[in-house]
Structures are given as C-alpha cells and as structure tokens.
Swiss-Prot record:
The organism's place on the tree of life at top rank: Eukaryota
UniProt name for this protein: Conotoxin Fi5a
Domain-level remarks: The cysteine framework is V (CC-CC).
Any one Gene Ontology cellular component term annotated for this protein: extracellular region
Expression sites (tissue/organ): Expressed by the venom duct.
Length: 13
C-alpha cells in the first residue's frame, strides 16, 4: 500500500 493523507500522488497510475 502506498496511499495516505499528504501523499495522494503515490497511488496515481
């Protein structure tokens, strides 16, 4: 998992 508040770009395709 790599998606949390402050790092939404982490879960972008």
């Amino acid at each position: 998992d790599c998606c949390w508040p402050g790092r939404p770009d982490c879960c972008a395709p």
